[in-house]
Amino acid sequence: MKTHPMTALERCATALLTAALLLPSAALAQREGVDVGANSGFASLVPAKEIELSAAKQYKTLLAEAASKNALAPPEHPQLQRLRRIADQLIPFANEWNPRAKSWQWEVNLIGSKQINAFCMPGGKIVFYTGIIEQLKLTDDEVAQIMGHEIAHALREHARERMGKSTATSIGAGVVSQLLGLGDLGRTVTNYGVQLLNLTFSRSDESEADLVGLELAARAGYDPQAGVTLWQKMSASSKGAPPQWLSTHPAGNTRIMDIERNLPRVMPLYERARKG
């Protein structure tokens, strides 16, 4: 069978995809805290800035819809002030996990709804629903665990990674030409933007977010043991019709055991933070 030599574009496409998939991240230096390894090379297939811009647009639309229903909490709302105070304590520790976080325009908002839900979109756009706070009767330590978990998804760029994997499955000369600036990749990312709120993460992503969130909360002075009580509450609340947050955040004994196994790594950070 006659074979044809690869074109320059095909060679470039092969090299680009290989680099993205095999990209070895620099080994993490010995550090205190949890060990979740390096970010996936798939994320490099999608520009971070485009994802963050799409997220910001979707976030703005969500807040406008909530405001039109009188469901967006005003700045003086006690629970919103509480959330923003906790966020202010967590965010300074985000930069270690993702240097882009330094330039993010962080936002924290509260929407009145019975939904047991919360999220942090790429670029640091955080939303909590009143249902998750009120129905679970969350302590500050437990709020910090949820917020840390959601921030961790953004810091570890799990949404970008998922989109990168989707790109990789259909990659070809046309897609690669877009990645090389020869096409309109922005349109592809914009199409993904409408799906950002509906993305579900893998079990690996969820475990990683649990641990990174655990460390963020500990460094900010919130008790890591609240990660256990939080998931006990979540498990109890999931009986019957599971809440939306749990439908994309699988809970269970394995998850609690994983947190307990990592407590010795983060308790010293918490104790140091408490001492000031």
PLM feature spans:
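Bacterial N-terminal signal peptides that target proteins for export
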Residues: 2-16
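A Zn2+-metalloprotease active-site environment signal
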Residues: 2, 21-276
